[in-house]
Amino acid sequence: MEYIEGNTGKWEYVIGLEIHAQISSKSKLFSGSSTLFAASPNSQVSYVDAAMPGMLPVLNKHCVYQAIKTGLVLKAKINKYSVFDRKNYFYADLPQGYQISQFYYPIVQDGMIEIPTSTGDLKTIRINRLHLEQDAGKSIHDQSPYYSLIDLNRAGIGLMEIVTEPDISSPEEAAEFVKKLRNLLRYIGSCDGDMEKGSMRCDANISVRRIGEALGTRCEIKNINSIRNIIKAIEFEAKRQVDLLESGETIIQETRLFNVDSCETKTMRLKEEALDYRYFPDPDLLPLIIPDELINELKASLPELPDQKIEKYIKKFGLSQYDAGIIVSDEAVAEYFEKAANECNPKMLTNWLITELFGQLNKASIGIRECKITPSDFAKLIKLIEHDTISGKIAKTVFEIMFETGKAPDKIVEEKRLVQISDNKILNTVIDEVIAENSKSVKCYKSGKDKLFGFFVGQVMKKTECKANPTLVNKLLKDKLDS
């Protein structure tokens, strides 16, 4: 467990998260308006979204299906009876004057996610609930010093609010939880998890306490928009609370915002309680009844999940837990890997994926779906190395050409005459030349300066333009020099 080092001793983190995940759906939760990102302001607003008198909400069943699927992968209880409630508050970008949410009877309860800890063990983070709710619009304050603008394109978009128990004990655990959750949502297609676009937002409830003591007063940090900022926001807020408590002051229960530039949290407003929102069942919406048949149908439609893939990669392909975890952290990478791994050495493929391909993708700022190298061609490259057709060094050159052009590796090797030299006769001739040209170095080597061996290997590789089989060069050269 990680502690906060105060001036008077150690303190514990107590952290709970609320994740707002925008549901992947072409239309909003209670209207047929589009959910397309970055559309012109107020171009995707129906009469329902704008709260025109007499307009009634109609529930989008696809959003319900997405919530059920999410509940299933969270190993949670799907409530067959749930109710929509009105959460009443006034804000300019909430035209109804209330938000349709689920307070008393949510669609999902009692789930869990296991995350890796710093000790290498798995820790269970309990999920209290997942409920459906509609998003608010967007207030724009930087267009004029005299007024604000309202864009209602986002108003009414379906959200899943996923609420954890306060089981998280460090900023790193919070980050691991969000990464694991985001990956699960992406695998089942219920949310794209793009925090930069705001389709996944994190609120962190943070308190601190002396080791083993009762829970302290919590503060909520709103709308943290990246994994890195989750860590920074929690670290700052926990340290702020420790400093206050050690100075004899009290913690005020409040909502705070994280300033990305200063890496500090600032007061936003005093924390509201549930009573402040005057929740009551929405009279325009019937209770949501979910039959067993639908739950079973959606369960059968779920894809293979990350933890299942990790287990498969370890057993079937012999990968380490660490390497398997890296591959499954992106569904597209896992799909690419599986297509290639069935055609070549999976361990060698994994090494090349993680070191070479990831490096090039990061450099080009693209994802694996935009990569010009097909899984089949990647497998061909690995087989060329396996069969000693090309050396590892030449393979890197071939790989760079493949990445730029999308050409098949065998064609590149043929066009550029890069086939590895494994003919003993040819290599012995080159070795003889190197020995003849470096007689002084040969004498030094034979007098005990073994480190010169690498120099001779380098000379052979230079003469063959790195086409010589390095394993064979080492053997033949050693035989010659030691004779």
UniProtKB/Swiss-Prot annotation:
Which function does this protein serve?
Answer: Allows the formation of correctly charged Asn-tRNA(Asn) or Gln-tRNA(Gln) through the transamidation of misacylated Asp-tRNA(Asn) or Glu-tRNA(Gln) in organisms which lack either or both of asparaginyl-tRNA or glutaminyl-tRNA synthetases. The reaction takes place in the presence of glutamine and ATP through an activated phospho-Asp-tRNA(Asn) or phospho-Glu-tRNA(Gln).
Which molecular-function annotations from GO does this UniProt entry contain?
Answer: asparaginyl-tRNA synthase (glutamine-hydrolyzing) activity; ATP binding; glutaminyl-tRNA synthase (glutamine-hydrolyzing) activity
Q: Which domain of life is it from?
A: Bacteria
Family of this protein: Belongs to the GatB/GatE family. GatB subfamily.
GO CC, alphabetical? glutamyl-tRNA(Gln) amidotransferase complex
Keyword 4Fe-4S among record annotations:
no
Q: How does it assemble?
A: Heterotrimer of A, B and C subunits.
List this protein's GO terms for biological process: glutaminyl-tRNAGln biosynthesis via transamidation; translation
Q: Which SUPFAM superfamilies match?
A: GatB/YqeY motif (SSF89095), Glutamine synthetase/guanido kinase (SSF55931)
What is the enzyme's main class? Answer: ligase
Q: Which NCBIfam families match?
A: gatB, PRK05477.1-2, PRK05477.1-4, PRK05477.1-5
User: What Enzyme Commission number does this protein have?
Assistant: 6.3.5.-
Listed SMART domains: GatB_Yqey
Q: What is this protein called?
A: Aspartyl/glutamyl-tRNA(Asn/Gln) amidotransferase subunit B
Q: Which gene encodes it?
A: gatB
Q: Which reaction does it catalyse?
A: L-glutamyl-tRNA(Gln) + L-glutamine + ATP + H2O = L-glutaminyl-tRNA(Gln) + L-glutamate + ADP + phosphate + H(+); L-aspartyl-tRNA(Asn) + L-glutamine + ATP + H2O = L-asparaginyl-tRNA(Asn) + L-glutamate + ADP + phosphate + 2 H(+)
